[in-house]
């Protein structure tokens, strides 16, 4: 049964992946051998992920697979160990079928900056799939797997989930171990699921979460359960609504009516620091990314990153290098850290009396594949997703319709460590939309 399912998925990958470029490494013999072992293991049948076929973003270590981060820098580097999340997946009966494409070193929100070529959006082939977890979202959307892992630094799970019409979830900072993740910005990064249903997002989050001594930011949390959301106070932030295009705003307003029908109370909120989101996020991102890339010096892991990387990666390294210097760090980086505290404190304050916040995931529809955007135009896609990373919130995306065939995702955000509420709201909304 499991072997048969793996073979079916391998056939689909063979037929479809050439076109959409969602996966950059597949080892049929390896996954079939693991499937045969799993099928013979009677005890494994009781495991929660038994036989689930999973794709993993190319910045997460899976032993024996290349961990390239979709860059020439690491194109020949084979992961020597499993990341904590991969250990947990394997322990619970999951099968890794392949490695997903992504924006190079997670620098991008379009899926176009990969050394291995851009990923196409299975739901709108002339449009970007979003990024940086482009391949993970596209693989789930094109039914090349049951579920996938991505990472989210400023929207990198939620952005492609919205564009590709799938479910994505960024757990609260500290819920999931990042041991074995090649970080973009360590104070923002979280690993999370991309799935076909919100129930599956809950399932996979429960498997991968938990305290890990190898990641000191992690905390132990009780298993997340599906709760009744009747009576929830649902916040709607005026400034978040104002940023979104009119057509996307219409979809969100219809989604708000669904929550009313589910017995929720709608509460209007105001957040005065929306304008600080992008500069705060990117200044911290640049500095942390520059710091994390110093290991790619051409002596230990592969090529020297500055000599072979793409334009966006080089831009971030150069800016990060500049603002890390003593004469600039006080002017830019330290001010960004102050702004981060302002944003976080204000967010916690406005969320005090609500259970969740709902709104748009991205302010506009995905642009056309190959369309030239300035860096600021590209960064603007992140304006509604970066606040969750800056403030340590949990945040998920669930499909809420489409505009001319292009999917639109509803973003649901919750207070730190109230992941259960967000996942419950995602499940309830998805069921109401069926």
From Swiss-Prot:
Is Signal among the key words of this record?
no
Active site per UniProt: 57 (charge relay system), 132 (charge relay system), 156 (acyl-ester intermediate)
Name the UniProt key words of this record, in alphabetical order.
ATP-binding, Ligase, Nucleotide-binding, Protein biosynthesis
What reaction does this enzyme carry out catalytically? L-glutamyl-tRNA(Gln) + L-glutamine + ATP + H2O = L-glutaminyl-tRNA(Gln) + L-glutamate + ADP + phosphate + H(+)
What is the E.C. number? 6.3.5.7
Q: Name one GO biological process term.
A: translation
Q: Give the GO cellular component terms, alphabetically.
A: glutamyl-tRNA(Gln) amidotransferase complex
Per UniProt, the enzyme's principal EC class comes to ligase
* Pfam family of the protein (one): Amidase
Which top-rank group of organisms is this from?
Archaea
Named from the GO MF annotations, one term is: ATP binding
What InterPro entries has UniProt attached to this entry?
A: Amidase, Amidase_CS, Amidase_dom, AS_sf, GatA
Against PANTHER family, the record matches this protein to: GLUTAMYL-TRNA(GLN) AMIDOTRANSFERASE SUBUNIT A, MITOCHONDRIAL, TRANSAMIDASE
Assembly and partners?
Answer: Heterotrimer of A, B and C subunits.
User: Which HAMAP family does the entry link to?
Assistant: GatA
To which protein family does this belong? Belongs to the amidase family. GatA subfamily.
| Its biological purpose | Allows the formation of correctly charged Gln-tRNA(Gln) through the transamidation of misacylated Glu-tRNA(Gln) in organisms which lack glutaminyl-tRNA synthetase. The reaction takes place in the presence of glutamine and ATP through an activated gamma-phospho-Glu-tRNA(Gln).
Protein name in UniProt: Glutamyl-tRNA(Gln) amidotransferase subunit A
Q: Which organism is it from?
A: Methanocaldococcus jannaschii (strain ATCC 43067 / DSM 2661 / JAL-1 / JCM 10045 / NBRC 100440) (Methanococcus jannaschii)
């Amino acid at each position: 049964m499991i072997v048969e399912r793996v073979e079916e998925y391998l056939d689909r990958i063979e037929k479809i992946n050439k076109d959409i470029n969602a996966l950059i490494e597949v080892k049929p013999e390896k996954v079939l051998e693991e499937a045969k072992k799993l099928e013979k293991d009677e005890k494994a049948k009781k495991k929660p992920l038994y036989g689930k076929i999973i794709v993993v973003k190319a910045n997460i270590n899976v032993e024996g697979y290349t961990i390239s981060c979709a860059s020439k820098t690491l194109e020949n580097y084979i992961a020597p160990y499993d990341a904590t999340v991969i250990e947990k997946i394997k322990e619970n009966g999951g099968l890794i079928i392949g490695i997903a494409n992504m924006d190079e070193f997670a620098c991008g929100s379009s899926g176009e900056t990969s050394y291995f070529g851009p990923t196409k959006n299975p739901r709108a082939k002339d449009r970007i799939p979003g990024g940086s977890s482009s391949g993970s979202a596209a693989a789930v959307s094109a039914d090349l797997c049951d579920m996938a892992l991505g990472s989210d630094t400023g929207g990198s799970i939620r952005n492609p989930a919205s564009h590709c019409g799938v479910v994505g979830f960024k757990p609260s900072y500290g819920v999931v171990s990042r041991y074995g993740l090649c970080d973009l910005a360590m104070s923002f990064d979280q690993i999370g699921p991309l799935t076909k249903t919100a129930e599956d997002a809950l399932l996979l989050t429960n498997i991968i979460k938990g305290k890990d001594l190898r990641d000191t930011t992690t905390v132990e949390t009780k298993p997340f359960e599906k709760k009744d959301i009747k009576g929830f106070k649902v916040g709607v932030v005026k400034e978040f609504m104002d940023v979104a295009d009119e057509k996307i705003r219409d979809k969100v307003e219809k989604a708000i009516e669904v929550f009313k029908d589910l017995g929720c109370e709608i509460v209007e909120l105001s957040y005065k620091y929306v304008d600080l989101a992008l500069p705060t996020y990117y200044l911290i991102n640049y500095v942390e990314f520059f710091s994390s890339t110093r290991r790619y010096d051409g002596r230990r892991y592969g090529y020297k990153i500055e000599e072979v990387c793409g334009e966006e990666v080089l831009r971030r390294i150069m800016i990060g290098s500049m603002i890390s210097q003593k004469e600039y760090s006080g002017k830019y980086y330290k001010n960004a850290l102050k702004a981060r505290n302002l944003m976080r404190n204000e967010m916690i304050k406005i969320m005090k009396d609500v259970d969740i916040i709902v709104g748009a995931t991205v302010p506009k529809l995905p642009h056309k594949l190959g369309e030239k955007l300035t860096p600021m135009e590209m960064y603007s896609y992140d304006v509604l997703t970066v606040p969750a990373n800056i403030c340590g919130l949990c945040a998920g995306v669930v499909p809420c319709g489409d505009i001319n065939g292009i999917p639109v995702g509803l973003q649901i955000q919750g207070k730190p460590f109230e992941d259960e509420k967000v996942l419950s709201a995602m499940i309830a909304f998805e069921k109401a939309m069926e």
